[in-house]
From Swiss-Prot:
One cellular component term from this protein's GO annotations in UniProt: cytoplasm
Source species: Anaeromyxobacter sp. (strain K)
Keywords per UniProt: Amino-acid biosynthesis, Cytoplasm, NADP, Oxidoreductase, Proline biosynthesis
Identification of the protein by name: Gamma-glutamyl phosphate reductase
Protein encoded by which gene: proA
Involved pathway(s): Amino-acid biosynthesis; L-proline biosynthesis; L-glutamate 5-semialdehyde from L-glutamate: step 2/2
BP GO annotations: L-proline biosynthetic process
Length: 427
């Protein structure tokens, strides 16, 4: 019986992927105005379907709460009228971005007279595998559509009802613009085997993008025959150098940890130069503790904070290198900049790293030597975001160096081909 079910699921996923492949072919040369019209119509459909979408989301949230998920997880899953309006606004924003398809990125003429151009083209079919983030369903569908790609969307089971309701609104936009319904498809089953069946279809799917925790990333990378571009965890560090201005240190630590702790560019570890720890740690620690952050400290940091009357607890062995996604922060005192660089090299996840310093030489060395998709100097880790960096909307933040590194916007959802023109040239 299990084998029959598996064969049925495999056939279902192949049929779904084949429809996506056909849609991708049509999207590769679709009129940009038609794609933009679909996005705007989808935004309007979300507004009209608000009651239905929020009702389905409430069912998802209730089930996740009953399953014992934590507050940060529930926050990522939850939709409300304001967040839904933000999703619709993002569709209008994406519609207003420049279409990357067909953009000439370079051109030259060879001595033999050949005219050569490099132009952007869609990747094809993109499989997006993600956890309980309903907004990703729409963001990924929209960015793939704008860049001429078909999207197969595989949300976590906790967000399936919400995602199907949002996808129905998106499908309405596609229909109104006369684009293929299979341009954006949500995998309709919570069965994990469906993901594995899709990951085997390297003849139909061009790229898989897993976005979530370590177990999700590992499962996709280990089982996939499709090229994988990882959007891995964000173990983001904030290093306070010896010359860090105390108030700036407080502001950046608070913003990085407290503003939205459940996202991948939140600060997860605070490193402090030993020579300034006595001056910097008490005000920074007090501000964080007052904001409800649990400080998990190495012995030196713990002693300094306890002496200053700031609530803190000893760090556990695995707290360094951990993505908490909650109001928890690992804290360590390091000898100097070398110590900070060594710590980040060992525990960082190639996502975002930040330094607070007045010393230009320290800032430049930090920028040179830290291996991450974004390196911040006197700025919060929260700025590693497509919109904040001026790239427009993003499908996620890649921690894989091939084919894109950092926020993935429209350009990163394309590849390039050569167009060569001659006059009967032979070699």
């Amino acid at each position: 019986m299990r084998k029959e079910k598996s064969l049925g699921l495999a056939a279902e996923m192949r049929t779904l992927a084949e429809a996506s492949r056909e849609a991708a072919r049509a999207l590769s040369h679709a009129d940009p105005r038609r794609k933009d019209a679909a996005l705007r119509a989808a935004a309007e459909a979300i507004g009209r379907r608000e009651k239905r979408i929020l009702s389905e989301n409430a069912r998802d949230v209730a089930a996740a709460r009953a399953a014992g998920q934590n507050a940060a997880y529930l926050d990522r899953l939850k939709l409300d009228p304001k967040r839904l309006a933000g999703i619709a606004a993002a569709l209008h924003e994406i519609a207003g971005l420049r279409d990357p398809v067909g953009e000439v990125t370079a051109s030259w003429r060879r001595p033999n007279g050949l005219e050569i151009r490099k132009v952007r083209i869609p990747l094809g079919v993109v499989l997006m595998v993600y956890e309980a983030r309903p907004n990703v369903t729409v963001d990924a569908a929209a960015l793939c559509l704008k860049s001429g790609n078909a999207a197969i969307l595989r949300p976590g089971s906790d967000a399936l009802r919400s995602s199907l309701a949002l996808a129905a609104a998106f499908a309405e936009g596609l229909e109104k613009a006369g684009l293929p319904a299979a341009s954006a498809q949500v995998v309709p089953t919570p069965d994990r085997e469906a993901t594995y069946e899709l990951l085997a279809l390297d003849d139909l799917i061009d790229l898989a993008i897993p976005r979530g925790g370590p177990s999700l990333i590992r499962a996709v990378a280990e089982r996939s025959r499709v090229p994988v571009l990882k959007h891995y965890q964000g173990v983001c560090h904030l290093y306070l150098d010896a010359s860090a201005p105390p108030q700036q240190a407080v502001d950046l630590a608070l913003n990085g940890k407290v503003q939205r702790p459940g996202v991948c560019n939140a600060t997860e570890c605070l490193l402090v130069h030993r020579g300034a720890a006595g001056k910097l740690l008490p005000p920074v620690g007090r501000a964080l503790a007052d904001a409800g952050v649990e400080l998990r400290c190495d012995p030196t940091a713990l002693t300094i904070l306890k002496r200053a009357g700031v609530a803190a607890v000893p760090a556990r062995p695995d707290d360094f290198g951990k993505e908490f996604l909650d109001r928890i922060l690992a804290v360590r005192v390091v000898a100097d900049l070398d110590g900070a660089l060594d710590h980040i090299a060992r525990y960082g996840s190639l996502h975002t790293e930040a330094i607070v310093t007045r010393d230009l030489a320290s800032a430049r060395r930090f920028q040179r030597e830290v291996d991450a998709s974004a390196v911040m100097v006197n700025a919060s880790t929260r700025f590693n975001d497509g919109g904040e960096l001026g790239l427009g909307a993003e499908i996620g933040i890649s921690t894989t160096k091939l084919h894109a590194f950092g926020p993935m916007g429209l350009a990163e959802l394309t590849t390039q081909k050569f167009l060569v023109e001659g006059e009967g040239h032979v070699r």
